[in-house]
Amino acid sequence: MGQTVTTPLSLTLQHWGDVQRIASNQSVDVKKRRWVTFCSAEWPTFNVGWPQDGTFNLGVISQVKSRVFCPGPHGHPDQVPYIVTWEALAYDPPPWVKPFVSPKPPPLPTAPVLPPGPSAQPPSRSALYPALTLSIKSKPPKPQVLPDSGGPLIDLLTEDPPPYGVQPSSSARENNEEEAATTSEVSPPSPMVSRLRGRRDPPAADSTTSQAFPLRMGGDGQLQYWPFSSSDLYNWKNNNPSFSEDPGKLTALIESVLITHQPTWDDCQQLLGTLLTGEEKQRVLLEAGKAVRGNDGRPTQLPNEVNAAFPLERPDWDYTTTEGRNHLVLYRQLLLAGLQNAGRSPTNLAKVKGITQGPNESPSAFLERLKEAYRRYTPYDPEDPGQETNVSMSFIWQSAPDIGRKLERLEDLKSKTLGDLVREAEKIFNKRETPEEREERIRREIEEKEERRRAEDEQRERERDRRRHREMSKLLATVVIGQRQDRQGGERRRPQLDKDQCAYCKEKGHWAKDCPKKPRGPRGPRPQTSLLTLGDXGGQGQEPPPEPRITLKVGGQPVTFLVDTGAQHSVLTQNPGPLSDKSAWVQGATGGKRYRWTTDRKVHLATGKVTHSFLHVPDCPYPLLGRDLLTKLKAQIHFEGSGAQVVGPMGQPLQVLTLNIENKYRLHETSKEPDVPLGSTWLSDFPQAWAETGGMGLAVRQAPLIIPLKATSTPVSIKQYPMSQEARLGIKPHIQRLLDQGILVPCQSPWNTPLLPVKKPGTNDYRPVQDLREVNKRVEDIHPTVPNPYNLLSGLPPSHQWYTVLDLKDAFFCLRLHPTSQPLFAFEWRDPEMGISGQLTWTRLPQGFKNSPTLFDEALHRDLADFRIQHPDLILLQYVDDLLLAATSEQDCQRGTRALLQTLGNLGYRASAKKAQICQKQVKYLGYLLKEGQRWLTEARKETVMGQPTPKTPRQLREFLGTAGFCRLWIPGFAEMAAPLYPLTKTGTLFNWGPDQQKAYQEIKQALLTAPALGLPDLTKPFELFVDEKQGYAKGVLTQKLGPWRRPVAYLSKKLDPVAAGWPPCLRMVAAIAVLTKDAGKLTMGQPLVILAPHAVEALVKQPPDRWLSNARMTHYQAMLLDTDRVQFGPVVALNPATLLPLPEKEAPHDCLEILAETHGTRPDLTDQPIPDADYTWYTDGSSFLQEGQRRAGAAVTTETEVIWARALPAGTSAQRAELIALTQALKMAEGKKLNVYTDSRYAFATAHVHGEIYRRRGLLTSEGREIKNKNEILALLKALFLPKRLSIIHCPGHQKGNSAEARGNRMADQAAREAAMKAVLETSTLLIEDSTPYTPPHFHYTETDLKRLRELGATYNQTKGYWVLQGKPVMPDQSVFELLDSLHRLTHPSPQKMKALLDREESPYYMLNRDRTIQYVTETCTACAQVNASKAKIGAGVRVRGHRPGTHWEVDFTEVKPGLYGYKYLLVFVDTFSGWVEAFPTKRETAKVVTKKLLEDIFPRFGMPQVLGSDNGPAFASQVSQSVADLLGIDWKLHCAYRPQSSGQVERMNRTIKETLTKLTLASGTRDWVLLLPLALYRARNTPGPHGLTPYEILYGAPPPLVNFHDPEMSKLTNSPSLQAHLQALQAVQQEVWKPLAAAYQDQLDQPVIPHPFRVGDAVWVRRHQTKNLEPRWKGPYTVLLTTPTALKVDGISAWIHAAHVKAATTPPAGTAWKVQRSQNPLKIRLTRGAP
């Protein structure tokens, strides 16, 4: 238990600081959270073997790196810094990584060389691969085709063309005729091929063996190695689709390469690695291994045979032999077989169906795409006649909609071939209407539709007018007839009642309210609401439809449908929610119209319950139940005398359920049975008590609540926060329900608070929560009377073991709010569908109001008071809305539960039937599990604590301690266990989670898992409290007798306050008993308590030592512990540390009073009475007073007549501090003597006698836990108390006027202290108190070097005093000078000049030997100064390397141009270092993709491929994409030093020139379009003379740019272009007269000596931090120099080169220096110093 496994990921997290430092050295930045995410979740998905816990295997890291750096959309550029840092950790592991890194394998040779083998026999010829053999004789060296790069340039006109290849000599053919016959067919490579392949010197080995392989026949018949060039691989990769997209094409390419190039095993791996991904390569190798056949010709699975034919590791085949070449031929054949098998993708008809014809795509082009999809995603050949039908059907179905519909209507479609279908489709495609025709047709249709609509509206208006006339006529006729009947028959009214006649029984003598015949008693229960059918109308303001009708639940709302067998589809008239895009044409009596369908919510149920998609017809008079839904229901309609009845197929009533699609899963869920199912009788017998049957509750006996405001309160109005559509729709049903129930009403109020939608965990449901914090601040506070759950269960006796738990539903809503208080809780709500736009407020007590729990708890308690009186044998506990009823038997519990439910129903409260626990012996209440008179922690409570992750912040730690603290009664010693965690919760404390915190965290969780069962407190029995104390922590267990055993009731623990923690053990036990007795009182409820402890503390409490306890604390302890009616002390017992219960054997008791008497003082013989035979009797005093606004202080030690010691103290010293200093000085001067010392300071006297020892035990802390004042002086006094042989410190009154010895001595000491305070302060240190004896210099030790130097300076030696004297001062030796100056420098780290000025200003009594040299050495070797101080290093100017001809050496850089225009914000600048020619391209992004695109599309076609590129370390240049492209093209990309723009000086200066020119042009032209003005800026840059007087244009083209006057009439003469020969002659002249002299001049600059920097290999240097944070040193290191150049350094630990101007030398102390130990002011600390040599 407690052990953890260290993984690479956890190791890096433990050393995260080192990881960040290594990442910074790699010029990247990493974050811990993303580090963990990539390692544990992202990289394992690459399927390259990366484990979730990380690895330091370089092979796996390189595979992950290749995936991360993959170009295009498959790459992961955001993961580049993290994998680069992983690789740096594994490649150059720090000490904490080395044990986890496997040793590196020996490096493989970069160029494989064949060992000399035996002479090969003439091989047999192969039909596929021609056999090539080695020549026996050596051939002469081949003539050089291309000139040397360092030689002179080629004369393009005079030089002869390069020679062609030389044919093999005749002697070679004579020596081996067969070989000659074989090789005659293979011609030597052409010069162009040689140029593309690269120049290589001929092998220097013996001509009988081949030093390079694979297998290219040279001119002399010898096999030579011609590897794949980077351009070949690049072209194959980019000009062909990937293997996953088109495996056939890539397989054909590889097959042709294998035949024509005859690659070796290594070249095959290189080819596969370039053209295939890692997964594709593995699949090919696996399929190739399956194709290996055994001796019987069948595929074999024997590993030895498979590895022999198709090895996965590099084999040792000798290609000079026939056997080796045969192995290679077989390997290529198997590789081709693997490619073909791996390329067979599985059948995926979904991909084929996804190929559809485009809007403007021709049918023939679509057919070709369809066939290609068949070839790629299916094993079928679309050209096969057997597949023509499938292809034809796909062509018809996936064609454009208009073409497909017409093709489906073709006659005799089965007999049509695919060609016929394509021809028909072409005809349809060509006859499509043009866009103009289509617009004209749509316009005509719209006009016709509008015309029909107007005619229908006019007809409808005429019909409406005629109907109104007929109805008015009928109404008038009815009125006339009614008047006639009235006149004939008179009025028919209810007979008038007499004054004393009852309206109910019509008898006289009483009224209706007093009628005895009228039924009395409570109103009967309301009829139970049907969950599926309602008899209401179908909508607001709408009469119910005629019979037959059925009421269904649609979207949570009841809707009454008219059963209409004539309707084909069921219809809804109200808005049913979201509608689908589908619509249908509905033809009715009044005409036809198109209506939309509701969203598809169909769910078929075997029970007859269905959901349905309805047609939304707002114009329909009634919702209709059509034939579609009646058919699915298998409904039966019976016509009887009472009317039509609609029932199911078995005669049962129909039940139709409509719900949203997201709730469909609930239909398939199995109902979760409760622990004890609530019987239906409880629901039916008490319908008014349950929320499920009684509706919303209302407390009928409670008056509306008035919420009083504070006197200074003003209305607060906070706008509603933005709310998402999902959240608004989620809380909308709740708002609607509360509006319907009258709990919410519209209002207008100056108060407004926001509504917050809170998502319920695990569901998509939201509930509205109102933010009432501002309202709570303005409402008067009331005293909370909610019970404390800590001691609530103390009122539950263990004898009551039958329980009922009820949870009131929407309890706060049962209390009404007074209308005057309702505006306080208003909030905004808008619902256009309901017509609500404004404020709503609560008519009931809202949730979130701070006084709601107290108000409801008091109201319910008052309402249930009668129930408690009527049932005294039952126990009813109430915590707000949670009720617990306990009884002794099941019958009493059922009887009491029935009475409680009846009472709740009558009072208007509603309980939740889902959460009810009725008459059970085991229930859950307030997070506890109650059973058989005991309580446990519930599993949910334990899982809550166990499920919390390791805290990372103080807030998370506080949450954990709060959750675990709820369970502290079950954890013995919880306070001591959690002690390491509490300091991290303080504000402003650094959160440092260490091993101690982790151990405490795990111990709390482990203790929670083993939490015991605690008995419920029985208030009829006495309690016993066992108490123990250890290291300032009180621990105890509260028990009660259960037969012969003690049953734990609670485990108590608490930390003592700092004052009590500093007491002796016996007094700490008193404090522990007092603390735990107070906590136990919350559970015992004032019952008798017996305290048992290992100390006899009762005597201590009755007679406490006044020196340790204050009067207030003493009174508090006595009042609590000496209450004999409630607290009694038992016998002294020895406790078990684990259980805190008594042990069988007892230890010998001790007397606490004796122990306190022995430990109350600091020195046992210290007394306050004069010693008769004292050697000295001294008087001490300290003085502190204000004079001229400055506080002066002094201290003195005197006798009655003379001053022994007096000293002025620093300004601001207090009188108490001065008294301590004086008393301490007296004790030091009386070392080894008998001393009587008098002081008039109560503070110094009490510190020496009493408080000093208390402070020492308490850790020098006050009672509030703060550090005491005068800490150093008190420590010095406590130390000096033991110096005299015998000591008596006596207190005497101050400022006495008598003539006694005490009075004279005190006055003398007071006068001496005041006089000393008036003098100048010589020393500021108050702890280095000097002796009263005269000053004598210390004894110096001079070395031989010191003596030699002293003799040279003319110093004299003082024989009497034993030291050398120079200039009248004692000479301090070199070593002592170093120690003094080193201590002085470390105080404030001044500069050498400041130290010299300080020493010159202060007159030193010594002559310091070699002072200036030592000061310089101390400041140079100070590590803090070296890391912070700036450096003034001056480095000489270097020489920039330039190209030897145009286009070979470029510098590139990005520069930002503001303001951006058309999205162009950056300018990519290329500068040719030879000519100064500049190319600039405006770009929108500063990325590596832009750099490579411009390089390949602009620079390369115009100037050729560069040999060298220089740039800074920007992300676009240092990225893997740019560097990989440069490596592939053979470009040497030089990254300049970081933060050194001078390294890219040419391109940086060009950036400035371009931007300055653009600024001038924009000002002159008045336009901001710098992109338009860029060519003019480039023209100026290209035609500005350089340092040699030539412009870049002249250097490149050999002549100035042509300047043409377009107004010159002779301009036509200038348009004649010179011939090609003239151009070449001019180019030759440029080469001879310009390029060669410039190249020579640049070379001369390189040959000139450059003053290098002073750093050498092996030096230690500090490296500058270019980005420093607050309080972070300016320099980092020191680092060791590994490599140097004239201007840069390479140091150990940083990958990039560093410019010499960014480092400074680190002075390290010599190895011969010795360490010395020095004392410090703190007696618990020492100082280690190292002196100068």
Curated annotation (Swiss-Prot):
The keyword Zinc-finger applies. Residues 1442-1600 form the Integrase catalytic domain. CDD domains: RNase_HI_RT_Bel, RP_RTVL_H_like, RT_ZFREV_like. One of its GO terms (molecular function) is zinc ion binding. Its EC number is 3.4.23.-, 2.7.7.49, 2.7.7.7, 3.1.26.4. Mg(2+) 3 binds at residues 1181, 1219, 1240. PROSITE patterns: ASP_PROT_RETROV (PS50175), ASP_PROTEASE (PS00141), INTEGRASE (PS50994), RNASE_H_1 (PS50879), RT_POL (PS50878), ZF_CCHC (PS50158). Residues 739-930 form the Reverse transcriptase domain. A motif (PTAP/PSAP motif) lies at residues 109-112. Residues 526-535 have a biased composition (Low complexity). The keyword Manganese applies. A lipid is attached at residue 2 (N-myristoyl glycine). RNA binds at residues 721, 771, 773, 787, 851, 853, 1054-1055, 1082, 1184, 1186, 1242, 1266. A motif (PPXY motif) lies at residues 161-164. Keywords: Aspartyl protease, Capsid protein, Coiled coil, DNA integration, DNA recombination, DNA-binding, DNA-directed DNA polymerase, Endonuclease, Host cell membrane, Host membrane, Hydrolase, Lipoprotein, Magnesium, Manganese, Membrane, Metal-binding, Multifunctional enzyme, Myristate, Nuclease, Nucleotidyltransferase, Phosphoprotein, Protease, RNA suppression of termination, RNA-binding, RNA-directed DNA polymerase, Transferase, Ubl conjugation, Viral genome integration, Viral matrix protein, Viral nucleoprotein, Virion, Virus entry into host cell, Zinc, Zinc-finger. DNA binds at residues 941, 955, 958, 966, 1063, 1113, 1187, 1214, 1216. Disulfide bonds: none annotated. Residues 139-218, 449-497, 511-549 are annotated as: Disordered. It comes from the Viruses. The modification Phosphoserine is found at residue 190. Residues 449-464, 484-497 have a biased composition (Basic and acidic residues). The record marks 129-130, 213-214, 476-477, 532-533, 657-658, 1328-1329 as: Cleavage. This is Gag-Pol polyprotein. The lineage of its organism: Viruses, Riboviria, Pararnavirae, Artverviricota, Revtraviricetes. The gene is gag-pol.
